[in-house]
A protein has these predicted regions:
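Active-site beta->alpha loop and helix N-cap motifs at the rims of alpha/beta catalytic domains
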Residues: 2-147
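N-terminal cationic-hydrophobic initiation segments that often serve targeting/anchoring roles
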Residues: 42, 73, 101, 130, ...
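C-terminal alpha-helical cap/extension of soluble enzyme domains
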Residues: 2-6, 16-21, 40, 44-45, ...
Length: 304
């Protein structure tokens, strides 16, 4: 596992994959299957993994957190940067901060929640986490009510933030008042588009952010990598053509659950056995699985 400090070059050199977490039938961590998924992504050019919402870390038992981190360290290639998540609740994040001190992860992300939280309280939680863990935090902005651009900028200016995962969904990503304000207050080099391949072109081209996170990259890592490279080369026609390849699976994720569709898609495509879904979530209805399988396999076929 890569343990060097976070740099702009790191953020821009790889799509930041946000994978599901594979589990055995008894809900224990499936080391071999998680390793298999990581190898698939690594082969496709991915060098940064973010374990967060798609890994359903919202519902992980605090008693399992140390085992999760230990597993990720063991199965990750030496040149791969792993970003675990903490929280979303304050007490959970503080306990996880102590555990993180036992490892060499360069940064960790606080999972967002709107209830019960207030923007000033979120900022305080970030400060406490950084102090207790000894590492900078990834700030995940998923809703405008979570934290203000001004508070986010204060955290950045105080040297507490490694990077920002920006994921507020707008009907038209070109018209994004929050992001427009954020990039005036924070260096766009520290901001990563956090909504997958679909708005990545607009976010990088029009707002100047550094890179993007994605879930469907777990299916077709080489294609998502090609998309990032095309954007960085300003080859917009190629980038748009590649972006279209992800639409079918992304539409299913948006319609039925980004987390659950990806969880099923990885297994149905034959990449790795993701296993059962950890409660409070649950598996999608069987009637949806053929559509997910078709879209996942079609996308995987383009990855060759």
């Amino acid at each position: 596992m890569k343990t060097t400090p976070v740099t702009f070059e790191d953020l821009q050199s790889s799509v930041i994959a946000v994978p599901p977490l594979c589990r055995n039938k008894n809900l224990s961590l499936a080391k071999s299957q998680n390793s298999r998924l990581i190898k698939h992504m690594h082969k496709g050019g991915i060098r940064t993994l973010l374990y967060g919402g798609n890994a359903n870390l919202y519902n992980i038992a605090p008693s399992e957190y140390h085992s999760l981190l230990k597993m990720l360290v063991k199965i990750s290639p030496e040149d791969m940067w792993i970003v675990p998540s903490v929280g979303p609740m304050y007490g959970t994040a503080m306990d996880q901060a102590k555990i993180l001190r036992e490892f060499a992860f360069p940064t960790a992300m606080l999972l967002p929640t709107l209830f019960p939280s207030k923007p000033a309280g979120v900022a305080t939680a970030i400060r406490h986490f950084v102090e207790k863990s000894g590492m900078k935090a990834v700030l995940y902005i998923k809703d405008a009510a979570y934290i203000t651009p001004e508070l986010a900028a204060e955290l950045v200016n105080d040297g507490l933030i490694s990077w920002i995962k920006y994921a507020i969904v707008e009907p038209d990503p070109k018209k994004d008042p929050y992001l427009k304000k954020l990039i005036k207050l924070v260096d766009p080099k520290l901001i990563v588009s956090g909504i997958g391949e679909q708005p990545s072109i607009i976010h990088l081209r029009d707002f100047g952010v550094t890179g993007f996170t994605a879930g469907c990259v777990c299916i077709a890592p080489s294609r998502s990598t090609a998309l990032l490279n095309a954007i960085l080369k300003k080859d917009w026609a190629t980038a748009e053509a590649i972006r279209e390849e992800f639409v079918a699976l992304e539409d299913l994720r948006n319609a039925h659950s980004p987390i659950l569709v990806l969880h099923h898609a990885v297994e149905l495509a034959g990449i790795a056995q993701t296993g059962p879904v950890l409660p409070l979530l649950t598996a999608l209805p069987d009637k949806l699985l053929p559509k997910i399988e078709k879209a996942a396999k079609a996308l995987l076929a383009k990855n060759a």
